[in-house]
Amino acid sequence: MTTAQNHTHYYPGATYMHALTLATEAYISQFSKKEVQASAVQIIMQLNQAMAIAIENAGLAEAMLEKAVEQAEQLSERGYGGYAQAIGYAVHFNYFISEGLAEAIVLPELLRSYGAKAEQQIASLARQTGIVAIDLPDERTARLFISWIEQQRILFELPDYIEQMHPQDIPDIIDETLDAALHFYPMPVFYDAIDLEQFISPLLASNKSKID
Protein backbone atom coordinates (compact mmCIF):
# COMPACT_ATOMS: atom_id res chain seq x y z
CA MET A 1 0.00 0.00 0.00
CA THR A 2 1.43 3.36 -1.01
CA THR A 3 0.84 6.60 0.84
CA ALA A 4 1.31 10.30 0.18
CA GLN A 5 4.48 11.81 1.55
CA ASN A 6 4.51 14.46 4.27
CA HIS A 7 5.64 17.24 1.96
CA THR A 8 4.91 18.29 -1.59
CA HIS A 9 6.44 16.13 -4.31
CA TYR A 10 6.18 16.36 -8.05
CA TYR A 11 4.22 13.32 -9.07
CA PRO A 12 4.04 12.86 -12.85
CA GLY A 13 1.27 10.37 -12.11
CA ALA A 14 -0.65 12.83 -9.96
CA THR A 15 -0.33 15.46 -12.66
CA TYR A 16 -1.68 12.97 -15.19
CA MET A 17 -4.59 12.05 -12.91
CA HIS A 18 -5.40 15.71 -12.27
CA ALA A 19 -5.68 16.46 -15.98
CA LEU A 20 -7.60 13.23 -16.57
CA THR A 21 -10.07 14.16 -13.82
CA LEU A 22 -10.64 17.66 -15.17
CA ALA A 23 -11.14 16.40 -18.71
CA THR A 24 -13.48 13.58 -17.67
CA GLU A 25 -15.66 15.78 -15.48
CA ALA A 26 -15.79 18.49 -18.14
CA TYR A 27 -16.97 15.95 -20.71
CA ILE A 28 -19.81 14.58 -18.58
CA SER A 29 -20.99 17.96 -17.28
CA GLN A 30 -24.70 18.31 -18.01
CA PHE A 31 -24.18 21.60 -19.86
CA SER A 32 -20.99 20.58 -21.65
CA LYS A 33 -20.84 21.84 -25.23
CA LYS A 34 -19.49 19.96 -28.23
CA GLU A 35 -16.28 21.99 -28.35
CA VAL A 36 -15.71 21.37 -24.65
CA GLN A 37 -16.18 17.64 -25.12
CA ALA A 38 -13.84 17.69 -28.11
CA SER A 39 -11.21 19.43 -25.99
CA ALA A 40 -11.64 16.85 -23.22
CA VAL A 41 -11.10 14.02 -25.69
CA GLN A 42 -7.98 15.70 -27.07
CA ILE A 43 -6.58 16.20 -23.57
CA ILE A 44 -6.97 12.54 -22.61
CA MET A 45 -5.45 11.36 -25.88
CA GLN A 46 -2.53 13.75 -25.38
CA LEU A 47 -2.00 12.44 -21.85
CA ASN A 48 -1.79 8.88 -23.13
CA GLN A 49 0.52 9.88 -25.98
CA ALA A 50 2.82 11.54 -23.45
CA MET A 51 2.99 8.39 -21.35
CA ALA A 52 3.64 6.26 -24.43
CA ILE A 53 6.83 8.19 -25.27
CA ALA A 54 7.95 8.89 -21.70
CA ILE A 55 10.79 6.36 -21.70
CA GLU A 56 12.22 7.32 -25.10
CA ASN A 57 11.72 11.08 -24.81
CA ALA A 58 11.10 12.22 -21.24
CA GLY A 59 11.45 15.91 -22.07
CA LEU A 60 8.81 15.86 -24.78
CA ALA A 61 6.53 13.71 -22.63
CA GLU A 62 6.75 16.19 -19.77
CA ALA A 63 6.00 19.11 -22.10
CA MET A 64 2.97 17.29 -23.48
CA LEU A 65 1.81 16.48 -19.97
CA GLU A 66 2.08 20.08 -18.83
CA LYS A 67 0.25 21.28 -21.94
CA ALA A 68 -2.58 18.84 -21.26
CA VAL A 69 -2.86 20.09 -17.68
CA GLU A 70 -2.97 23.69 -18.90
CA GLN A 71 -5.75 22.89 -21.35
CA ALA A 72 -7.69 20.92 -18.72
CA GLU A 73 -7.46 23.78 -16.24
CA GLN A 74 -8.83 26.14 -18.86
CA LEU A 75 -11.96 23.99 -19.03
CA SER A 76 -12.20 24.15 -15.25
CA GLU A 77 -11.87 27.92 -15.26
CA ARG A 78 -14.84 28.08 -17.63
CA GLY A 79 -16.95 26.26 -15.04
CA TYR A 80 -16.79 22.73 -16.40
CA GLY A 81 -15.88 20.55 -13.46
CA GLY A 82 -17.21 18.21 -10.85
CA TYR A 83 -17.04 16.77 -7.37
CA ALA A 84 -13.75 14.90 -7.82
CA GLN A 85 -12.02 18.12 -8.77
CA ALA A 86 -13.69 19.92 -5.85
CA ILE A 87 -12.49 17.23 -3.42
CA GLY A 88 -9.01 17.43 -4.92
CA TYR A 89 -8.99 21.18 -4.37
CA ALA A 90 -10.10 20.83 -0.74
CA VAL A 91 -7.39 18.24 -0.03
CA HIS A 92 -4.77 20.40 -1.75
CA PHE A 93 -5.88 23.46 0.22
CA ASN A 94 -5.59 21.64 3.54
CA TYR A 95 -2.42 19.62 3.03
CA PHE A 96 -0.56 21.30 0.15
CA ILE A 97 -0.32 18.10 -1.88
CA SER A 98 -1.27 17.56 -5.50
CA GLU A 99 -4.98 17.58 -6.25
CA GLY A 100 -4.40 14.52 -8.39
CA LEU A 101 -3.58 12.37 -5.37
CA ALA A 102 -7.13 12.67 -4.03
CA GLU A 103 -8.78 12.83 -7.45
CA ALA A 104 -7.21 9.53 -8.47
CA ILE A 105 -8.95 7.85 -5.53
CA VAL A 106 -12.38 9.47 -5.65
CA LEU A 107 -13.01 9.87 -9.39
CA PRO A 108 -13.83 6.19 -10.09
CA GLU A 109 -16.21 5.97 -7.13
CA LEU A 110 -17.99 9.18 -8.11
CA LEU A 111 -18.39 8.03 -11.70
CA ARG A 112 -19.83 4.71 -10.53
CA SER A 113 -22.24 6.49 -8.21
CA TYR A 114 -23.79 8.44 -11.09
CA GLY A 115 -25.08 5.20 -12.58
CA ALA A 116 -27.39 5.47 -15.57
CA LYS A 117 -27.40 9.27 -15.37
CA ALA A 118 -23.83 9.43 -16.69
CA GLU A 119 -23.05 6.08 -18.29
CA GLN A 120 -23.93 7.22 -21.82
CA GLN A 121 -21.54 10.18 -21.56
CA ILE A 122 -18.81 8.10 -19.93
CA ALA A 123 -19.19 5.44 -22.62
CA SER A 124 -18.99 8.08 -25.35
CA LEU A 125 -15.79 9.46 -23.83
CA ALA A 126 -14.32 5.96 -23.58
CA ARG A 127 -14.97 5.29 -27.26
CA GLN A 128 -13.80 8.65 -28.57
CA THR A 129 -10.51 8.43 -26.68
CA GLY A 130 -9.93 4.85 -27.80
CA ILE A 131 -9.81 3.59 -24.23
CA VAL A 132 -12.60 1.14 -25.04
CA ALA A 133 -12.51 0.45 -28.75
CA ILE A 134 -14.86 -2.51 -28.98
CA ASP A 135 -18.59 -2.16 -29.59
CA LEU A 136 -20.22 -2.82 -26.25
CA PRO A 137 -23.36 -1.49 -24.52
CA ASP A 138 -22.98 1.84 -22.74
CA GLU A 139 -23.18 0.33 -19.27
CA ARG A 140 -20.38 -2.14 -19.95
CA THR A 141 -18.25 0.45 -21.76
CA ALA A 142 -18.62 2.92 -18.89
CA ARG A 143 -17.58 0.25 -16.37
CA LEU A 144 -14.49 -0.60 -18.41
CA PHE A 145 -13.51 3.06 -18.61
CA ILE A 146 -13.86 3.49 -14.86
CA SER A 147 -11.77 0.37 -14.28
CA TRP A 148 -9.15 1.80 -16.63
CA ILE A 149 -8.97 4.96 -14.50
CA GLU A 150 -8.36 2.82 -11.42
CA GLN A 151 -5.60 0.97 -13.22
CA GLN A 152 -3.84 4.24 -14.05
CA ARG A 153 -3.57 5.06 -10.35
CA ILE A 154 -2.13 1.63 -9.66
CA LEU A 155 0.33 1.82 -12.58
CA PHE A 156 1.59 5.18 -11.34
CA GLU A 157 1.88 3.74 -7.81
CA LEU A 158 -0.15 6.60 -6.39
CA PRO A 159 -1.52 6.41 -2.84
CA ASP A 160 -4.90 4.88 -2.06
CA TYR A 161 -5.37 7.12 0.97
CA ILE A 162 -4.22 10.54 2.15
CA GLU A 163 -1.76 10.05 4.99
CA GLN A 164 -2.14 13.59 6.31
CA MET A 165 -5.91 13.40 6.71
CA HIS A 166 -7.53 12.91 10.12
CA PRO A 167 -11.19 12.23 10.98
CA GLN A 168 -11.59 15.67 12.52
CA ASP A 169 -10.63 17.24 9.19
CA ILE A 170 -13.55 15.78 7.28
CA PRO A 171 -16.23 18.43 8.08
CA ASP A 172 -13.97 21.22 6.83
CA ILE A 173 -13.04 19.26 3.71
CA ILE A 174 -16.72 18.63 2.97
CA ASP A 175 -17.51 22.34 3.37
CA GLU A 176 -14.63 23.33 1.11
CA THR A 177 -15.68 20.73 -1.44
CA LEU A 178 -19.23 22.08 -1.53
CA ASP A 179 -17.92 25.63 -1.87
CA ALA A 180 -15.64 24.67 -4.76
CA ALA A 181 -18.41 22.68 -6.47
CA LEU A 182 -20.63 25.78 -6.60
CA HIS A 183 -18.42 27.17 -9.36
CA PHE A 184 -19.11 24.27 -11.70
CA TYR A 185 -21.92 23.56 -14.09
CA PRO A 186 -24.36 20.86 -12.92
CA MET A 187 -22.91 17.41 -12.41
CA PRO A 188 -24.97 14.35 -13.39
CA VAL A 189 -26.16 13.97 -9.78
CA PHE A 190 -26.46 16.60 -7.04
CA TYR A 191 -24.76 15.67 -3.76
CA ASP A 192 -25.04 17.33 -0.37
CA ALA A 193 -22.69 17.14 2.61
CA ILE A 194 -24.00 13.77 3.77
CA ASP A 195 -23.58 12.31 0.29
CA LEU A 196 -20.05 13.64 -0.09
CA GLU A 197 -18.90 12.13 3.19
CA GLN A 198 -19.16 8.64 1.64
CA PHE A 199 -16.53 9.65 -0.92
CA ILE A 200 -14.27 11.67 1.38
CA SER A 201 -14.13 9.35 4.41
CA PRO A 202 -12.44 6.53 2.44
CA LEU A 203 -9.46 8.86 1.95
CA LEU A 204 -8.59 8.26 5.61
CA ALA A 205 -5.79 5.81 6.32
CA SER A 206 -7.87 4.37 9.17
CA ASN A 207 -10.46 3.18 6.65
CA LYS A 208 -7.93 1.19 4.63
CA SER A 209 -6.54 -2.28 5.12
CA LYS A 210 -3.16 -2.31 6.82
CA ILE A 211 -2.03 -5.22 4.63
CA ASP A 212 0.40 -4.04 1.92
Tell what function each PLM region has.
Residues T8, P12, S32-E35, S39, ...:
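Catalytic cores of large soluble enzymes that bind and process phosphate-bearing ligands
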Residues M1-G79:
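Carboxylate- and glycine-rich phosphate/diphosphate-binding segment that chelates Mg2+/Mn2+
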Residues H18-A26, Q42-I53, A63, E70, ...:
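Alpha-helical scaffold segments in soluble metabolic enzymes
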Residues Y27-S32, S113-Q120, S209-I211:
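Short helix-capping/linker segments at secondary-structure and domain boundaries
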Residues V132-D212:
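C-terminal charged capping/lid subdomain of soluble metabolic enzymes
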Residues I97-D160:
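Active-site pocket-lining segment
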